[in-house]
Amino acid sequence: MQNLQIREKLALDIILFGKICFPNMFSTESPPFHYEIAALLQDSNNNKLNIIAPRGHAKSSLIACVFPIWHMLTQEGPKFIVLSSKTEGHAVRLLQTIKNALEYSAELRSIYGYWGQHSAKQWARTEIVLKDDTMIMCR
């Protein structure tokens, strides 16, 4: 399968995007509710969502890491993404997960090119500005 075909397929499926680009985050089978969340996230009619699930069910991995990167790489134009959490420390950890994924995922790099620190316009503790002017910040 050629790179463009892979990108087109991944643009339609957040879970598949995560499994391919971040295999270490998807080491077990995704439960059915992850597919429900993904469908809600992919529906452009939903501009506000409140997802509630027990601790340890990979909500943050899917919603605060995989989805922002998927959205950034599969939808046109620069994005403004705010990682909001109860504490700034938790939001910073979420951003660090994104930064690690952008910097170190060989799978992501092979499909979308390099999006890590050396191509970014800003790469700070609480915010990053990527090469396409997408900004991801903590609050």
Which stretches of residues belong to each language-model region?
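Short, well-ordered loop/turn elements at secondary-structure boundaries
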Residues: 45-46, 77-78, 131-133
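Contiguous, well-ordered alpha-helical segments that form the cores/surfaces of helical PPI scaffolds
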Residues: 35-42, 61-73
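N-terminal accessory segments
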Residues: 1-47
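Walker A/P-loop
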Residues: 46-68
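Conserved nucleotide-state-sensing and coupling region of NTP-binding domains
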Residues: 84-137
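Post-Walker A helix-loop "phosphate-sensing" segment adjacent to the P-loop in P-loop NTPases
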Residues: 70-79, 103-107
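Residue-level preference for the first positions of well-ordered beta-strands
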Residues: 48-50, 80-82, 135
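Alpha-helix boundary/capping segments in eukaryotic regulatory proteins
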Residues: 57-63, 73-80, 85
